[in-house]
């Protein structure tokens, strides 16, 4: 049984043949940390978390290097920090922490490496200098631009002609550009900007363009060639197209990534969920409603990853009912881990066909309720928990699941927030959190050394 993945670059479903089975390399575009992630952003993280699990199953964890970056330098970050009246570092640290909390809530594994853009400026400068030396980039009006027309096969990933690619795309106008489509590799500092958002370079004080960041970090940790590059379908153009162009031009012998995997949009009433449209729901919103993270994860896996997925209350409720059914099926059964069933693995090996994988788990649940012997019930229940665990679900006990008013993740997060408030002598906030938990019949007991325990009333 071999893993098949749809490769956007070739527009075909291919057998996954890594360059080195003992050293598999995967890069996924991570968040720009200017605001709390919405669940559309989180779909990408959950999809590639599943792919990571599948590849680990085949090749072993030590053989897989999974890099997911943090973009912590960007005009949106600058604008947001100014709007909130806080420093860039305070904003990016806060949003990065929130991102990690969200991913834990969704049951995502940590990547092998999570590099920050601001810590790799030297690598970006090195690649830009290579591009200038090879006449693929030029300096104009204190900017460094990439010359799009100098890149061979620029349209290969998008499979569209150059004019069509740029229709409806916002292009930065500059009389000094060679071509309107040329994109920025390095931009100069603006007047009255905070000093810590700009960096020294051969072209003066400034900061990198967005696209060069991922080329630099993938090169730093994975080299010139690697196996998988993942991200949302909205990144095919311009971000991934520009990544390929600048990386291949900087390293002419490089093919860059072999397999390009893209997940579909999350929609709301048929429109793409996005902050610019104002139709987004953050992961924090769902956490505050005390919707279980497993429910959201199952919802995000309920549609094939390449298809659009529409967010609505019914879809969330359906995911909750499905998990209720699974947890009820294993109730009062001494389940044990068994080998992953071959039909279940075949579904995941077929371009991560999660709808089929979920149906197979449902079928095992049905079998539990019609099983004629205890051995049959135990086998089917064990298959449920084994399959669900593999895709990051059913991480709770039946007691924890069916006592949803006691969400330990939510409670512990509030306790940590309260402890922080106490250390800062913010007694008003500390009391507010205590009362908030008391309303849910959660009693806090403060011990020495800032330790707090809790119990249900």
UniProtKB/Swiss-Prot annotation:
It catalyses: tRNA(Cys) + L-cysteine + ATP = L-cysteinyl-tRNA(Cys) + AMP + diphosphate. One of its GO terms (biological process) is cysteinyl-tRNA aminoacylation. Its cofactor is Zn(2+). One of its GO terms (molecular function) is zinc ion binding. A motif ('HIGH' region) lies at residues 31-41. InterPro entries: Cys-tRNA-ligase, Cys-tRNA-synt_Ia_DALR, Cys-tRNA/MSH_ligase, Rossmann-like_a/b/a_fold, tRNA-synt_1_cat_dom, tRNAsynth_Ia_anticodon-bd. Gene3D superfamilies: Cysteine-tRNA ligase, C-terminal anti-codon recognition domain, HUPs. Zn(2+) binds at residues 29, 214, 239, 243. Disulfide bonds: none annotated. Keywords: Aminoacyl-tRNA synthetase, ATP-binding, Cytoplasm, Ligase, Metal-binding, Nucleotide-binding, Protein biosynthesis, Zinc. A motif ('KMSKS' region) lies at residues 272-276. Its EC number is 6.1.1.16. The keyword Membrane does not apply. The keyword Cell inner membrane does not apply. Its main location: cytoplasm. Binds 1 zinc ion per subunit. It is an enzyme of class 6 (ligase). Signal peptide: none annotated. HAMAP family: Cys_tRNA_synth. Belongs to the class-I aminoacyl-tRNA synthetase family. Monomer. This is Cysteine--tRNA ligase. It comes from Rickettsia prowazekii (strain Madrid E). The lineage of its organism: Bacteria, Pseudomonadati, Pseudomonadota, Alphaproteobacteria, Rickettsiales. The gene is cysS.
